[in-house]
């Protein structure tokens, strides 16, 4: 079976305050949307659709370089979901999860329970049994009570067999509160799986503090360091952090000798306790002769994600007298961010000298140091 997830991120989120839609606000060092997307970086999920508001131009540009499938938001939530479903047409999807971007604390256990329930039912969703007394009210006064037995607070992801929910949305007149209501209108059976009190939906400003507490209590943070050095040799340019920089000499190495990218790659491997580039790409193997270092970095990033981690930020320092790094630093930052699928503000590239001491001070080569921070929610 082929499973997809649709992350609905086209809302404006005005009740949460902050001046920007809540999915783009910071939360525990990252954006809400970043946390939510990472929750669905699971082996069982082969495709992820991110539904974006048409006016979120920066987000469209940022995610266009990632493996995500992008879809435009509709005039309401149902329209956004339909656009997300349409983006999966022809991909052979059998199961689909539909999730609100404003639920960044959803657990892998909840996602797995929904997927498992779809083996026996055309629909499944997490729900929390209502335990509080329920009132009705008007003008600040209690006007009555309601029986709470059999009542559940709905959560996401709400999962469905793909063809069934596509047909249900096509037939629905609109105005549904969620996708379970759409499914029920089409007479689909929807199983209730246990919800999670921590799977809150960020709606109001105070919800950010609670979500941050939840994320930080289980967060696994790893740090890795990388160091590399290459000597100068004949040439007319060097490649640093993926950017070709004119110089009167080149750097010598088995691959393209990108000392900065090598240090960052080793920092990622180090955080995972996976050795260094040489373990994964032995210099004794001729197939890596002259290879682009992007290959190594992508491998490290893929390994990070396969282990359930996300790259929080990267810091790389280049040590050399020449060439001058400053004029190229922003371009290097953007290129590294592109390769790793990060926003540029999470990648730092800077330079220093050794005050003319040592081999870098004698302009015999370039050294690079890097630190990588990984997080697992």
Curated annotation (Swiss-Prot):
CDD domains in the cross-refs: CDP-ME_synthetase, MECDP_synthase
Residue numbers binding a divalent metal cation: 228, 230, 262
Keywords assigned: Isoprene biosynthesis, Lyase, Metal-binding, Multifunctional enzyme, Nucleotidyltransferase, Transferase
Catalytic activity: 2-C-methyl-D-erythritol 4-phosphate + CTP + H(+) = 4-CDP-2-C-methyl-D-erythritol + diphosphate; 4-CDP-2-C-methyl-D-erythritol 2-phosphate = 2-C-methyl-D-erythritol 2,4-cyclic diphosphate + CMP
2-C-methyl-D-erythritol 4-phosphate cytidylyltransferase: annotated segments: 1-221
InterPro entries linked: IspD, IspD/F, IspD/TarI, ISPD_synthase_CS, MECDP_synthase, MECDP_synthase_CS, MECDP_synthase_sf, Nucleotide-diphossugar_trans
Chain residues that bind 4-CDP-2-C-methyl-D-erythritol 2-phosphate: 228-230, 254-255, 276-278, 352-355, 359, 362
Pfam families: IspD, YgbB
Cofactor(s), names only, from the UniProt record: a divalent metal cation
2-C-methyl-D-erythritol 2,4-cyclodiphosphate synthase: annotated span: 222-377
Gene Ontology biological process: isopentenyl diphosphate biosynthetic process, methylerythritol 4-phosphate pathway; terpenoid biosynthetic process
Protein name: Bifunctional enzyme IspD/IspF
Organism: Ruegeria pomeroyi (strain ATCC 700808 / DSM 15171 / DSS-3) (Silicibacter pomeroyi)
